[in-house]
């Protein structure tokens, strides 16, 4: 998913967010046994995860979104999921990620869930922010009973 272009001034203070964009992860054709059960995403650890803030490091990219080589972290800006620290990469209980109810798909005999998240930019430091394209990523697994 792609966040919108924002002005550097939209991120005035450390912790301020901008460019919030909703994205969905849709689960389809779930087994009937999951009907009424809670499912969620477990965000994996990796090189893009800032374990201190719970956000994703943002890396400089070219105009096509291709990361610079070697990777260069953007100063004082990161990517945030869900408007609060999810503690990406930590164990399931410590992540505090939301869960979603599996239900029957309207007009169908199948079951599924739509997992809705919000991604945004977040100011992570007090120094200057350099304009440019940024990129980040995180792996995830689906958690279910």
UniProtKB/Swiss-Prot annotation:
GO terms for biological process: cell adhesion. The keyword Signal does not apply. Its main location: other. Gene3D superfamilies: Fimbrial-type adhesion domain. GO terms for cellular component: pilus. SUPFAM superfamilies: Bacterial adhesins. It is found in: Fimbrium. The keyword Transport does not apply. Keywords: Fimbrium. InterPro entries: Adhesion_dom_fimbrial_sf, Adhesion_dom_sf, FimA-like. Belongs to the fimbrial protein family. This is Protein FimA. It comes from Bordetella pertussis. The gene is fimA.
